[in-house]
UniProtKB/Swiss-Prot annotation:
This is Cytochrome b6-f complex subunit 4. It comes from Spinacia oleracea (Spinach). It is a multi-pass membrane protein. HAMAP family: Cytb6_f_subIV. PROSITE patterns: CYTB_CTER. It is found in: Plastid, Chloroplast thylakoid membrane. Component of the cytochrome b6-f complex, which mediates electron transfer between photosystem II (PSII) and photosystem I (PSI), cyclic electron flow around PSI, and state transitions.
Amino acid sequence: MGVTKKPDLNDPVLRAKLAKGMGHNYYGEPAWPNDLLYIFPVVILGTIACNVGLAVLEPSMIGEPADPFATPLEILPEWYFFPVFQILRTVPNKLLGVLLMASVPAGLLTVPFLENVNKFQNPFRRPVATTVFLVGTVVALWLGIGATLPIDKSLTLGLF
């Protein structure tokens, strides 16, 4: 059972806020039926209406039409698969490449056990998790940018 905080209606600060119309959710307002029946459907239907309106007013093509007689030299995946594509492209052994890809989520699953993250919310007080995040972001960007370059410049990004 959760502990509910009852408002102190004798508190002059709370009475002043309530008199001004503030403090609407100070002691809680039930999500049923107010939010779930009235606010959420309006937001969802409004989002759908905006998407449909933009699709009708400005239709865009999905991509270039396919030409089977003029294929590109190298077929690139979507941008979010660039780091994975770069790993598979640069590692000579395909089994090792697949194991490297599987080691990324396995390594991320070990991060919570390396330090007690339940105690602190501030990232500066969680150096291991912050370091893993920063190194992972830099490596993912490095691999993603390298996937768009030719294979001889892909690891150095043409800088060295």
